[in-house]
Amino acid sequence: MSILQLENVSVIYGDNVQTKGLNNLSLETKAGEFVAIMGPSGSGKSTLLNAVAGILPATSGRIQVAGRAIDGLSDEEAAQFRREELGFVFQEFNLVETLNVKENIVLPLMFQHQSVDVMEERVTKLAEGLGISAILDKRVTEISGGQRQRVAIARAVIHQPALLLADEPTGNLDSKNSKEVMSVFKELNEQLNLSIFLVTHDAMTATYSDRIIFIKDGRLYNEIYRGDDELGYKQSIINVLEMMGE
């Protein structure tokens, strides 16, 4: 079953000088697949993520998430779609500093008007799995960058989204915390069969994925699959990036 389909999608923006953020791009990802998106700066990676999220409308083509066409949704419908079907993890964490860790995590469930029992059950289970049970009552200003990203991940998946979108989630982390956070993504993917669509410029981060889609100038440039050879996978990533001029 496909979780995400793009058919000949183009995104053109700008008034006086028009830019093609995506140029007739087609791709498909399966449910439960962990896909990384790589490419040079300005290649269209963030544009792709915003188009999939329904934030940036496609100029032409068709986008489906979990069997639902998202092109043509009204602003209100797109917002509801994002709340129900998508989870987001960003480089900057985007946590609410006036709330504690637990309150940040349950925010999506509050918007869905879930019961307190459901909130308690889910946050307890997630916190245990992510190793953040001991910090649930702390303010986000009192925890480390790696812990903040774990909290952001918990918030992104607590409402059980169809697809998790991540934009440079290790960009503000050191190598140790980056590896720990990517291990969390991999565990969620494997244990919950969570579909993940992750943008990164970092080869190490990309090695945690099942497949990497490379885009350049808004077009599909190449794609590679992980297989069983992790070292070979990383070398293939480096080879493609070198061909792209990265």
Give the label of every model feature segment.
Residues 164-167:
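Catalytic Walker B motif of ABC-type/P-loop ATPase nucleotide-binding domains
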Residues 38-40:
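The feature captures the beta-strand-to-loop junction immediately N-terminal to the Walker
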Residues 53:
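Helix-to-loop junction immediately C-terminal to a conserved catalytic motif
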Residues 139-143, 147-149:
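Conserved ABC ATPase signature
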Residues 61-69:
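Conserved ABC transporter NBD signature motif
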Residues 158-162:
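A short, proline-enriched helix->beta-strand linker immediately N-terminal to the Walker B motif
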Residues 99-107:
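Short coil-to-helix segment of the ABC ATPase nucleotide-binding domain corresponding to the Q-loop/switch region
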